[in-house]
């Protein structure tokens, strides 16, 4: 009876913080799934932007002054990154349009027409996508939101950010790298990915040593892991 009463009266509405947490958590799982199944780079961008919006209330869950500062930093830095990623996505579409090809963001079409894509626009698009999605991944030096967000959010939220949000952004970057490889621009992409990955690993290694907060240590560990992933695809293969 007690369980039925909770359901009838609306547990999520009577316990607002927990209700918001559960709703945002479910929204995050949905948007993360959309990122994984999307084969359209525009829809992929929308889904990654949605992950930012639904995870922000999770960082603010404790409702302290420090958590609201961390949330605003997460949003502002994330929005700058996602805006640059949008410009990069437009550049990929224009790389096809500039050569008289159909203007498309479907990954399969871009891969099929990759050799005919405009190389300058493709390179510009990849640079913007690397900076944009690299910000969401937390690659150094665009990682500034991570220590505060991980440190002030509940532990489970930090795990979701480390294992979910950053992985979604990495998937988007890997798909952009696929287009570069198909277009014969793998060397150009690797020249950007390798130093970025190494720098991220170095920064994380330097800053994690002085940390005493385990959640901030997780943040710098995530920076290092994202650097390893960038280094991995830069060395070869996506």
For the regions a protein language model found, what residue spans apply to each?
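Hydrophobic core segments of alpha-helical transmembrane domains in multi-pass membrane transport
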Residues: 32, 88-90, 128-133, 197, ...
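Residue-level signature of transmembrane alpha-helical cores of multipass secondary-active transporters
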Residues: 68, 74-78, 125-132, 159
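Juxtamembrane/interfacial segments at transmembrane-helix boundaries in multi-pass membrane proteins
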Residues: 2-13, 84-145, 170-192, 238
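Helix-loop-helix module between adjacent transmembrane segments
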Residues: 1-39, 131-135, 162, 166
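Functional transmembrane alpha-helices
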Residues: 40-56, 137-177, 191-238
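Physicochemical signature of membrane-embedded alpha-helices that form the seven-helix bundle of GPCRs
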Residues: 24, 77, 128, 193-199
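Alpha-helical multi-pass transmembrane bundles of energy-transducing inner-membrane proteins
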Residues: 20-27, 33-121, 207-238
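Entry/N-cap segments of selected transmembrane alpha helices
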Residues: 14-18, 75, 79, 189-194
């Amino acid at each position: 009876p007690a369980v039925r009463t909770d359901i009838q009266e609306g547990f999520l509405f009577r316990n607002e913080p927990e209700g918001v947490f559960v709703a945002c958590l479910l929204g995050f799982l949905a948007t993360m799934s959309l990122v994984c199944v999307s084969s359209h780079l525009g829809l992929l961008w929308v889904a990654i932007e949605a992950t930012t919006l639904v995870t922000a209330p999770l960082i603010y869950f404790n409702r302290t002054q420090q958590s609201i500062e961390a949330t605003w930093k997460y949003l502002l830095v994330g929005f700058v990154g996602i805006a640059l990623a949008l410009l990069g996505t437009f550049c990929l579409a224009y790389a096809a349009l500039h050569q008289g090809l159909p203007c498309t963001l479907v990954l399969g079409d871009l891969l099929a027409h990759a050799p005919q894509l405009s190389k300058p626009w493709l390179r510009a698009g990849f640079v913007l996508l690397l900076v944009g999605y690299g910000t969401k991944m937390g690659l150094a030096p665009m990682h500034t939101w991570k220590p505060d967000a991980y440190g002030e959010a509940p532990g489970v939220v930090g795990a979701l950010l480390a294992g979910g949000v950053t992985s979604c952004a990495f998937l988007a970057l890997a798909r952009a790298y696929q287009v570069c490889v198909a277009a014969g621009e793998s060397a150009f992409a690797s020249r950007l990915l390798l130093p970025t990955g190494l720098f991220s690993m170095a920064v994380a290694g330097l800053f994690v040593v002085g940390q005493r907060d385990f959640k901030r240590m997780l943040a710098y560990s995530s920076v290092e892991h994202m650097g390893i992933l960038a280094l991995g695809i830069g060395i070869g293969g996506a």
